[in-house]
Amino acid sequence: MKLKRLLLVASAALAALVFSAPAMALEKFKIGYLRVMDDAQAMAAYEAGLYKKYGLDVELIEFKSGTDLIKAIVGGQLDSGVFGFTNAVAWASKGADLKVVSGAQLGYHAIVAREDAHINKVADLKGKNLASQAEGSTADVVLKGVVFRDAGLKPDDVNVLGVSPQVAVQSLVGKRVDAAFLFEPQARIAQLIAPVKQIYEIGEVWPFPCMVVITSGETLKNRRAAVWKSLDAQRDAIELLKKKPADAAKLIAGYFIAEPTLKTLKHGEMLREDVIRDAIKSQTFSAKLNDKEQNRMQEIADILQAQGSLKTRDGKPFEVKSIVDLSWQKDRKL
């Protein structure tokens, strides 16, 4: 009887210890992102608790541009980031050890113009003011190396202002610029709140992997399991965005529109979740980087070199495959 009582006491003590102890410690992991729809999977994974599902305690850190974000990865302040790969190419050409480990989103960039600016096609931008991303960003490279080129424009034919997407929208509303080259949802928001129209969308004519997931070679070597867990979480978030855009919109709408509703010019007050849902539907998210997309990445790197913005140590063409590590993608059989 005494033995039975002792066993009961011991069992109760053990149970108390188990339930009072904190849950298994999550591994800390820092991810940089931009507040644009291209990075929706990073935000959705955080808000849906997917990082925790895979054992990570993630700190999401916002940056205004990929050119700033890459510095934090090179400097060791971040474990990974979702942003344009041209930033990694530029730093890798100087010797930085960086790795593209996953896809994220295929480029959606729209040119929207004020209706009173008399801009109906890209060629009409000559002599106009255009808000875009920071110089050297993937958006900037594609704008000048593809969009302008195909329209017969030279980079200096247009006064390009490098600002954040949020400032670009404000500049359109305030008539400080004639047009803007925007991500979603800023392109959609601009058309809802200001007298502007879309005249071009690069994804329709020249699709490319705009956003990818990048980490440092050191982080991938020393924390490969954690990097892969973060990619698993973002892959799940991409499935949520693709299959349940309305549910995903409820999670991330607050990142883009502060108030519950958006006051529009023609549709009255719109729920922010409805605006973001439609923006999500316009996107092509993919964690996989296929051969076609890798070839397009090489094409963009070649444009960088042709512009003189990318110089390798030996003067040879930069090989994008030298910074691509798709071991996670292969292991997950994507």
Describe the residue ranges of each PLM region.
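Periplasmic-binding protein-like
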Residues: 40, 105-113, 192-219, 223, ...
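Short, glycine-/small- and polar/acidic-enriched structural segments
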Residues: 25-162, 167, 171-174, 178-184, ...
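Conserved C-terminal helix/tail region of periplasmic/extracytoplasmic solute-binding proteins
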Residues: 297-334
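A residue-level marker of the well-folded mature domains of exported/periplasmic proteins
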Residues: 64, 170-180, 190-199, 208, ...
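N-terminal signal peptide c-region/cleavage motif recognized by signal peptidases
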Residues: 20-22
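Secondary-structure end/capping motifs
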Residues: 222-310
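Bacterial N-terminal signal peptides
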Residues: 9-18
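Bacterial N-terminal signal peptides that target proteins for export
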Residues: 1-10
